[in-house]
Amino acid sequence: MKISKILLGAAMFIAAPVVKGGCQVMAQNALQEPIVVDTPFVHDPVMAYENGKYYLYCTGHGITQMTSTDRKHWTIVSQGVFKNSEIPAWTHDSVPGFTTHIWAPDVIRFKNKWYLAYSCSTFGKNTSAIGLLSNTSLSDKDGWKDEGCLVASKGDRDNWNAIDPNFIVDEKGNPWLTWGSFWDGIQMIKLDKKTMHVKKGAKPQTIARRHAVGDASAEPNPTSKFAGTNAIEAPFIMKHGGYYYLFVSWDYCCRGIKSNYRVAVGRSKKVAGPYLDKAGRDMRNGGGTLLLEGDKKEYEAMGHCSAYSFPDGDFFFCHGYSVPKNGASILVQKKINWTEDGWLMLE
């Protein structure tokens, strides 16, 4: 069933968290009846599939979550992943100024357990952290366990930003984590199979960046003079055939109708790269084949994507800044088709 932007906005306002006793909790009149929408308002959507049901997680207080059986009608879960937005204390210690508004989660099933990574940060700074949760089933909304911090960055120590995590498992069954936004671009590190934390002795390596392009007309990050013109973030790796495909988002999100977000892609036969675009350019040196951008009619801009092989095919998801909805960020879903030479096209 369709629900207007006004009604949905009002319902979400009713369920909005309020500050009490130093933490954010759901208001007493929080939403009780489920709301079902066919075009949910989201930022940074990721998905998982379990027992005939799709689970969507995205940026929001306590990590916003929704469920669906057909990816057409989404039930908004009134409670975030973190019950009553009770975020682990370590997040506030690691990231001064961080609130309960969590960015860009990712979710994966590994060795009979679900893992969810999430971003803790503040705009324009790279003092950030990526947290980890675990659960035995996505249907157990109260079953998420805090597994602590995966990686963290500090502005006076690191030239990368610990946000926008993405898990990938290689052909040998080894888990890896990618992340990054601005600064020195997209990072990658190997994880331990037993703990899903960083493997002992592993070091981050850069697998994609923008500033090497040397584009003098590139727009600087308006929120931080230190982030430079390296407008790349939101990595997501999908394995298909004999290749790993690295999706990244270029340019700027979060400006509504003034956003210019877009998605680029490269591929590699090795999970750690090098990732090359269609022209053979290394993504570490500014390469990347443009895959998706706004058409200025339906969407002004689109970005921060994820991609999956589901029972009915391969699909690509992102958020798009809707022109008819005056720049509101909504869920975009596109079917993936593969060319004979192993590149993808979006319907």
Where are the language model's segments positioned?
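Repetitive helical segments and hydrophobic/amphipathic motifs
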Residues: 11-14, 201
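Generic detector of low-complexity/intrinsically disordered segments
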Residues: 9-10, 346
